[in-house]
Amino acid sequence: MAASGRGLCKAVAASPFPAWRRDNTEARGGLKPEYDAVVIGAGHNGLVAAAYLQRLGVNTAVFERRHVIGGAAVTEEIIPGFKFSRASYLLSLLRPQIYTDLELKKHGLRLHLRNPYSFTPMLEEGAGSKVPRCLLLGTDMAENQKQIAQFSQKDAQVFPKYEEFMHRLALAIDPLLDAAPVDMAAFQHGSLLQRMRSLSTLKPLLKAGRILGAQLPRYYEVLTAPITKVLDQWFESEPLKATLATDAVIGAMTSPHTPGSGYVLLHHVMGGLEGMQGAWGYVQGGMGALSDAIASSATTHGASIFTEKTVAKVQVNSEGCVQGVVLEDGTEVRSKMVLSNTSPQITFLKLTPQEWLPEEFLERISQLDTRSPVTKINVAVDRLPSFLAAPNAPRGQPLPHHQCSIHLNCEDTLLLHQAFEDAMDGLPSHRPVIELCIPSSLDPTLAPPGCHVVSLFTQYMPYTLAGGKAWDEQERDAYADRVFDCIEVYAPGFKDSVVGRDILTPPDLERIFGLPGGNIFHCAMSLDQLYFARPVPLHSGYRCPLQGLYLCGSGAHPGGGVMGAAGRNAAHVAFRDLKSM
């Protein structure tokens, strides 16, 4: 990583962080020997769980390994003066009731909605004085159709119907996100009370079926087929298909030709912000500001959050019930229940005494698919990139496309598939798929005047290189240079604008953020690891084989993304169990 000041851009001193970032919160009253509930990990789901439990009167403590809260939803000043959303970088999926219930606006959350939201520049020679074409999509359907018509009149006419079709599927899936999956084990073998409770979990499924109606078989195909098959049924132009397909493969070690890739696309279109379906935006101050707002909501009601307090072990009594945790320094903290925001692998294979868990359960956890294609590169630049397809304004101020997700090497679905095949051979993609975002285009607080922060979400990248070779600094820099070379073709001068960079390969994402294999979802969002089967079959309702232990992170239903649903749902399940103790 290099840092230097150039042009209009001046690096400034690091700014202070909130209290729970500078040190742990013992100064707020100290660590107590006992709480009603302990949450392992201060990722956004863990913070959401703590906030709900505390509001329900459950005295809750959160223990975070790192010096900063938020997990992957964090803001870090890696280069002085530049504040990066170091891992997660966009917001849309956070459940609307969490905004309301936790009063996040009251606790400082501010959003910048993006419109337009998608920009795909072409690599083609302009005819005469014409610049290369680009595809710019936003909330104005008429303008979207005009943009798409550059490539296909037919696709322009069909696009509103496609959007309506996907919107209906998102509406059907929506109720499933806010409740535990159907508890088939309780339904088949539980007590009468357990069976009655499990019947209530069928309601979201029945509601989804009613919404989809006679179109259910067609929607089933969307969830199970390769996204290329789905998109080919709608469209003919590659720039549009490839742009849409990026949402089906982002964060997933899959090709657009992989069966089931359609669900990941749906996962990225079913969100919304401030009542706008499908809207995505930037959090003012970076993603860490969201985590700060949730933490503020939790602590205002009495929750305790401790940083640099690593949980080493879940404590179990002689009757096989959870009774608290042991910290890395040997401190014992008793509790009636433990909610783990860490991955299923860390929770069950590292923190929980193995003798208390069924062998088959442990085997299934160890077999979870955690492959990740992602390398995240955070870049400080001294000016905005100027794309051949959309040159910068004379004074260098942000233009509409700068606020978008900018898709590079994405003009054709074949490019996406070829990038995937490289990784399957143990090689970094020759032409990586790049999603480039510039949050400082809407939030100038993230960088010094005249400067910007650039988020590069790139794939595909194997965890281990061909021949079993591990990542080292030379390989890491070589890959980042390749990514920069690709950007340079679309936006000449980009490389010269770079002030510094932070390169996070899959092993780095695993080491720093605890993401298994670097997987941003904790484990793959494939159909065999969703709903009934997340993290494993018969244990998808946040409860674990060990009484009093709950999974509340992205490895639980409904999965990854900055959604908060797993934390909220797990908190409600745990609270119901606590009342019945």
UniProtKB/Swiss-Prot annotation:
EC number: 1.-.-.-
Subcellular location(s) of the protein: Mitochondrion matrix
Keyword Oxidoreductase listed: yes
Molecular-function annotations in GO: oxidoreductase activity
Gene Ontology biological process terms from the UniProt entry: mitochondrion organization
Disulfide bonds: none
Recorded GO CC terms: mitochondrial matrix; mitochondrion
Assembly and interaction partners: Interacts with COX5B; this interaction may contribute to localize PYROXD2 to the inner face of the inner mitochondrial membrane.
Function: Probable oxidoreductase that may play a role as regulator of mitochondrial function.
Protein name, entry field: Pyridine nucleotide-disulfide oxidoreductase domain-containing protein 2
Organism expressing this protein natively: Homo sapiens (Human)
Gene assigned in the entry: PYROXD2
